[in-house]
Every structure is written in structure tokens, then in C-alpha cells.
């Protein structure tokens, strides 16, 4: 088991699949716009250090519009329009914990409290959803989740939609809580995402295991 994400990345960097993957992403960047930027590709690790993880929210792939993705699943930079899925997440937060929706979509405050906001694909070409999912990111994500499955404290995995549920099928350690539900996208949310109460369930589990709950409120104090 690793002790830091830096150690984990160094370990992966030696593996042939990862060398090929980084080359493929580099080639794609040379030909056009790829999101997020190279500096932000692993920012979920930077903002949520390995020894601080409490919750994992698994997304699919980064937003593919200019200026949106910055390496945290579901999150956008401040000043960027809040995407529809995140608006629905905010609606559920209001129903679940009576937290008013923030006027921005920047989720760094969650990450800094131990919420690992990761996607299963970690890069994407501009305007082409899912364009990098076959580059080798699935192997990388499996390895991240393997580390988390062996984590020494109980974690909560929030899995919205079949893609996330399938991707996390290797999370078998009984100490963890898996919250499985419908994806918050406008196409699916009305089929069971609303009133599923993932945020209060997460905090109840953390408190039960002696861990500090997440302050989900993103409004400027």
C-alpha cells in the first residue's frame, strides 16, 4: 500500500501502459485542445492528499468545453457556467441537508476536506466526450481504486450511474460504504437521483466511524 499519491504516481510511471498512455495524451495535446491542462490532470490528488481521503465521488470523463475541466470530477472553475449535472447535485444538497445552491461550480472546498473527486477518464479532446477512454485510463483508474480498496480507514464511495458502479466493481473491502444511485444528469436524475440523500448518508457513516463529517456548503461565508 502506498503512503502518498506522489508515491503512487511514481509507481505507475514505471509501468509500460502508463508510459504509452502519457505519450498518447501528449500526442493529442500537440494536435489540438485537450482538457484539463497538463498541470491540472491530477489535481484531485494535489487537493485531496492520500492520507486525508474520506469520500470518493467517481465521475466519467472531464468536461470537454473550453475552461471547464480542472481535474476534479463534476467541478468547474469559478466564473464558468454551472453544468446541468452539478445543478442537480446542488438541488439534492438542498433537499438532503437544506444547503443553498452555490453561485459557482468550484468544488475544491470538498476536495480539501477529503473528498476525492476523480473521473474514470482523466483527459478528453475538446468537443469530443469520451474521446480518451480507450487510451489506458481504465487501467490507471483500476489501480487508484485498488489502492483505495486497501485503505486503512473506512471510506465512502459515491457512485452515480451505471458507469461509476461498474468501474468500482473492484471495491470489495467490507469496511467501505458504497452509495450507488442514478446519475445526476438531466436525462437520468428524475429516475431516482433526487431524494436519494447521499450527503447525509455519507456524513452519518463518517461520524459512526469517528471521522469528521464533510461540510458540503460551498457558499462564501
UniProtKB/Swiss-Prot annotation:
Keyword Translocase: no
GO terms for MF: uracil DNA N-glycosylase activity
Catalysis: reaction(s): Hydrolyzes single-stranded DNA or mismatched double-stranded DNA and polynucleotides, releasing free uracil
PROSITE patterns: U_DNA_GLYCOSYLASE
Top EC group: hydrolase
Subcellular location field: Cytoplasm
Signal peptide residues on this chain, from the entry's feature table: none
GO annotation terms (biological process): base-excision repair, AP site formation via deaminated base removal
InterPro entries the UniProt entry points to: UDG_fam1, Ura-DNA_Glyclase_AS, Uracil-DNA_glycosylase-like, Uracil-DNA_glycosylase-like_sf
Active site: 61
Chief localization: cytoplasm
One GO cellular component, as annotated: cytoplasm
Keyword DNA damage in record: yes
SMART domains linked to this entry: UDG, UreE_C
CDD domains, per database record: UDG-F1-like
EC number(s) stated in the UniProt entry for this protein: 3.2.2.27
Keywords: Cytoplasm, DNA damage, DNA repair, Hydrolase
HAMAP family: UDG
Record's function text: Excises uracil residues from the DNA which can arise as a result of misincorporation of dUMP residues by DNA polymerase or due to deamination of cytosine.
Family the entry assigns: Belongs to the uracil-DNA glycosylase (UDG) superfamily. UNG family.
NCBIfam families xrefs: PRK05254.1-1, PRK05254.1-2, PRK05254.1-5, ung
The protein's name in its UniProt record: Uracil-DNA glycosylase 1
Species the sequence originates in: Listeria monocytogenes serotype 4b (strain F2365)
Gene name for this UniProt entry: ung1
